A protein has these predicted regions:
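Cysteine endopeptidase catalytic domains of the caspase/legumain-like
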Residues: 3-448
């Protein structure tokens, strides 16, 4: 046989061996005999209008639980103001789909009320018991190690580079270094994020989530669009779920988690969610692993979802949820007194939506009322790269205009892209801050 042919054959065999070795090495990183599954489930909102967020998280808990992840390795963070809320006619109950089961029973109350905040979340995720206890937390954390798989499900409002909590923001630039440090410190074998929030794709975009640290993330929306609520319930007078969350959980409820891969679940969720663009980030090879490697491997009785309505049919943008709920309630008002009360609340909601004018004033002042630039700032949606400027101006706006209640004002958050544009246009941070202070002094809405 000619030498050149022998060399070619040797190279081909070597390549096959290397590819096979890489393939085997990747899949041998599943939790071994000592490896464990951990889950951190977070609903970052409060208030009955946000019923759906805690419903999503409670449903996620039930999935993890029935597939064998024990309570000591499931951490739940939610304000817990829904199940027994005065507006909830079915006390002690939370459902995530029309006529669905009560998903509230058994859910651990690990972190509730004011303990649902960004700092607590980051410390819990990193397994920092002492730091958590120093903030009067329970001490229950994700105590994962190098052989473990960690699943994080976050549900709330969002904005460019931001995830909301009841009173504060979690910035992508706070989450990213924590995740990178966890990878460096061997705090997991694999880490998976499922994130339900508006503009959630911006949390992992660019170099915020590298593709070589064993982390995989999927998000409900891209970096520039809203996520959607679904399943308005006439009896409960609120939305029961969010489209992306409902889609992946209804899939997990009915399939064999030990055969379906994360990539397959992503594809199903992406296809079925036609209200926003479901995205994936990070190490996409992790998608070849089964869903059970992160949501639990024990077999469970499949749920028949064939009679559940399509969540896309009544889907509404997250920022329009409160307005939509009030309009639905107004249609069903039983008395003039009830109708008047709802109309008064509607007026307040409309006033809140008018906060866009506040943003316009900030922009106009910051660019010296140059009409072209002002229009451009409201037309473009630039990728966020100037994180330092952006974080500074967002936090300053929250401080000087507390009346906006920004962390829970989803409509105002939809216009944070204007602040992104200012920073990306290299407008000096101090100029933007000064403009905010001037507008805040002239705007009654900004006062508490």
């Amino acid at each position: 046989m000619a030498p050149t042919i022998l060399i070619s054959l040797a190279l081909a065999v070597s390549c096959c061996v290397l590819i096979q070795a890489d393939f085997v090495d990747f899949f041998e990183q599943k939790p071994n005999e000592d490896g464990k599954h951990w889950a951190l489930l977070v609903a970052g909102s409060s208030g009955y209008y946000n019923y759906r967020h805690q419903a999503d998280v409670c449903h996620a808990y039930q999935i993890m639980k029935k597939h064998g992840i024990p309570d000591e390795r499931i951490v739940v963070m939610m304000v817990d103001d829904i199940a027994h809320n005065i507006e909830n006619p079915d006390k002690g109950s939370i459902i995530n789909q029309p006529n669905g089961p009560n998903v509230y029973p058994g859910v651990p109350k690990d972190y509730t009320h004011e303990k649902v905040n960004p700092k607590m979340f980051l410390e819990v995720l990193q397994g920092n018991v002492e730091a958590v206890k120093s903030m009067n937390g329970s001490g229950k954390v994700i105590n994962s190690g190098p052989n473990d798989h960690v699943f994080v499900n976050f549900v709330d409002h969002g904005a460019p580079g931001i995830l909301g909590f009841p009173r504060e923001f979690l910035h992508a630039t706070q989450l990213s270094p924590v995740v990178k440090k966890m990878a460096k410190d061997n705090k997991f074998a694999k880490l998976v994020f499922y994130v339900e929030a508006c503009e959630s794709g911006s949390i992992f975009a660019g170099d915020l989530l590298p593709d070589n640290i064993n982390v995989f993330a999927t998000t409900a929306a891209n970096a520039h669009e809203s996520s959607y609520a679904c399943y308005f319930d006439n009896h409960l007078k609120t939305y029961l779920g969010d489209v992306y969350s409902v889609m992946w959980m209804q899939d997990s409820d009915k399939v064999n988690l030990n055969t379906e891969t994360l990539s397959k679940q992503f594809d199903i969720t992406k296809k079925e969610t036609n209200t926003s663009h479901v995205m994936e980030f990070g190490d996409l090879k992790i998608g070849q692993l089964t869903v059970g490697e992160f949501q639990g491997k024990s077999m469970a009785v499949a749920v028949d979802n064939s009679q559940v309505p399509n969540p896309n049919l009544d889907a509404v943008k997250s920022e329009d949820v409160k307005l939509s709920i009030l309009e639905q309630r107004l249609l069903r008002a039983q008395s003039e007194e009830e109708k008047e009360a709802i109309e008064n609340e509607l007026e307040i909601v409309v006033a809140v939506k008018n906060t866009i004018s506040t943003f316009k004033n900030i922009i106009a002042t910051a660019v010296n009322h140059q009409l072209y630039h002002t229009q451009m700032m409201f037309t473009l949606k630039r990728p966020l790269t100037q994180h330092t400027c952006y974080k500074t101006v967002v936090e300053h706006l929250k401080t000087v205009c507390p009346g906006m209640n920004l962390p829970q004002n989803d409509f105002a958050m939809r216009h944070f892209y204007t602040l992104v544009n200012l920073c990306e246009e290299q407008v000096v941070t101090d100029v933007i801050v000064d403009a905010m202070e001037k507008v805040a002094m002239e705007t009654k809405f900004c006062s508490v």
